[in-house]
Amino acid sequence: MKIRPLHDKVILKREEIETKSAGGIVLTGSAATKSTRGTVIAVGNGRTLDNGTVLPLNVKVGDVVIFNEYGVKEEKIDGETVLILSEDNILAIVE
């Protein structure tokens, strides 16, 4: 299934993080935190301003970003979990 976000929405695939501690202990539950980094897999056409102008997004497909977990929608697409969020929830692009 192909998915296309609307307006200022961005779709990410969350980066996997290490589930073992430095000592080799497998972390589970609250000790195994979710990553707040992800790879952009789709972007909307931009934010519509009050005057009708469409402002393009700053992120593009393939960018690795750091995002705020608040306001993120998890969705299963073809058995794969993706994250849908507004560009406002993206804090930085990792270069």
Curated annotation (Swiss-Prot):
Q: Is the keyword Chaperone in the record?
A: yes
Q: Which InterPro entries match?
A: Chaperonin_GroES, Chaperonin_GroES_sf, Chaprnonin_Cpn10_CS, GroES-like_sf
Tell me which Gene3D superfamilies the record gives.
GroES chaperonin
The molecular function GO annotations come to: ATP binding; metal ion binding; protein folding chaperone; protein-folding chaperone binding; unfolded protein binding
Q: What PROSITE patterns does this protein's entry cite?
A: CHAPERONINS_CPN10
What PANTHER family is this protein classified in?
10 KDA HEAT SHOCK PROTEIN (PTHR10772), CO-CHAPERONIN GROES (PTHR10772:SF58)
Per its database record, what is this protein's job?
Together with the chaperonin GroEL, plays an essential role in assisting protein folding. The GroEL-GroES system forms a nano-cage that allows encapsulation of the non-native substrate proteins and provides a physical environment optimized to promote and accelerate protein folding. GroES binds to the apical surface of the GroEL ring, thereby capping the opening of the GroEL channel.
| Protein name, as recorded | Co-chaperonin GroES
Native source species = Glaesserella parasuis serovar 5 (strain SH0165) (Haemophilus parasuis)
Q: Please spell out the taxonomic lineage of the organism that makes this protein.
A: Bacteria, Pseudomonadati, Pseudomonadota, Gammaproteobacteria, Pasteurellales
Gene name of the encoded protein: groES
